[in-house]
UniProtKB/Swiss-Prot annotation:
The gene is fmt. It catalyses: L-methionyl-tRNA(fMet) + (6R)-10-formyltetrahydrofolate = N-formyl-L-methionyl-tRNA(fMet) + (6S)-5,6,7,8-tetrahydrofolate + H(+). Keywords: Protein biosynthesis, Transferase. (6S)-5,6,7,8-tetrahydrofolate binds at residues 117-120. Attaches a formyl group to the free amino group of methionyl-tRNA(fMet). The formyl group appears to play a dual role in the initiator identity of N-formylmethionyl-tRNA by promoting its recognition by IF2 and preventing the misappropriation of this tRNA by the elongation apparatus. It is an enzyme of class 2 (transferase). PANTHER family: METHIONYL-TRNA FORMYLTRANSFERASE, METHIONYL-TRNA FORMYLTRANSFERASE, MITOCHONDRIAL. This is Methionyl-tRNA formyltransferase. It comes from the Bacteria. One of its GO terms (molecular function) is methionyl-tRNA formyltransferase activity. Coiled coil: none annotated. Belongs to the Fmt family.
Length: 317
């Protein structure tokens, strides 16, 4: 079976590696154009492109696939390339570009998507973040047949994964990426044998996992400690949850919710020492923050952080 693969970040690169290791022929990879990254803002290839080049897989990086969009000539060139590349199916994982119907219609066996949620629970761009943020106890991977709607297509395979109490988006991402790689291989093997069956998605229980905005990073300490602890895990590694102390943004990377009386105003630092970490009053309960970072600094354990940043008796806004 010949596969065109479309994906961009590390999540997708893990799936591409799994397909390559399983022996599937991959005549073409689509990925987003190189982007400026790092302190020097040098152009950097996506994780998918890096894997493809290392394994001598041809790569295309169209800026758009929409024939009716801002770049119709680029889109037409991409359509022509897809039609000229012999393949059976397209596999899509966190590609980042909209696939119009004109693209979905090209692969003889359609387009399969690896989605990091138990659909229809979280449709959209940030299902891992949102699952942690709201306190879901489990998530998983859905392999689905793509259609024009956003993550609305028929479900082909689904497998759940528990969300651990200390999972961050980073750790859960890695677990789901591995699971997604295993499942897309399984799905394609079943497709080859004609054993893959589709189940329509129910609309009941569908939620939209909106892309994480940088503005969400600043915590409202009037919320409960439980809510805030989940946000800190959900926003690790991006965008990094933060509080503002005397005008300075301080990122919180690790924290636990504590039960305590509400005798302090929200944001008040109750204690800041090597033994307790940094304990901050919230609207309900308190946060024990154990890893912090100031602008331009490194992520540090609380015991190290407070040596260079006085927090005792301070208040976060």
């Amino acid at each position: 079976m010949k596969i065109i693969f479309a994906g961009t970040p590390e999540f997708a690169a893990v799936a591409l590696a799994a397909l390559h290791a399983a022996g599937f022929e991959i005549p073409l990879v689509l990925t987003q154009p190189d982007r400026p990254a790092g302190r020097g803002m040098q152009l950097q290839a996506s994780a998918v492109k890096q894997f493809a080049l290392a394994h001598k897989i041809p790569v295309a990086q169209p800026i758009s696939l929409r024939l009716d969009g801002k770049y119709p000539d680029v889109a037409q060139e991409a359509h022509d390339l897809l039609r000229a590349t012999p393949h059976d199916v397209m596999v899509v994982a966190a590609y980042g570009l909209i696939l119009p119907q004109s693209v979905l219609d090209i692969p003889p066996l359609g387009c399969l998507n690896i989605h990091a949620s138990l659909l229809p629970r979280w449709r959209g761009a940030a299902p891992i973040h949102r699952a942690i943020e709201v306190g879901d106890e489990k998530t998983g991977i859905t392999i689905m047949q793509m259609e024009l709607g956003l993550d609305t297509g028929p479900m082909l395979l689904m497998e759940s994964l528990p969300i651990a109490a200390d999972d961050t988006t980073a750790s859960l991402h890695d677990k789901l990426a591995r699971l997604g790689g295993e499942m897309i291989v399984e799905a394609l093997l079943k497709l080859e044998k004609g054993e893959l069956t589709a189940t329509p998605q129910p609309e009941a229980g569908a939620n939209y996992a909106a892309k994480i905005a940088k503005e969400e990073a600043t915590l409202d300490l009037r919320q409960s400690a439980q809510e805030l602890a989940r946000k800190i895990r959900a926003f690790n590694p991006f965008p990094g949850a933060m509080g503002i102390c005397n005008g300075t943004p301080v990122k919180f990377w690790q924290a636990q919710a504590l039960e305590c009386s509400n005798q302090w105003p929200a944001g008040q630092v109750i204690s800041a020492n090597a033994q307790d970490g940094v304990v901050i009053a919230c609207g309900d309960g308190a946060l024990r923050v154990t890893e912090l970072q100031k602008p331009g600094g490194k992520r540090l354990p609380a015991a190290e952080f407070i040596k260079g940043f006085a927090l005792e008796a301070q208040r976060f806004q």
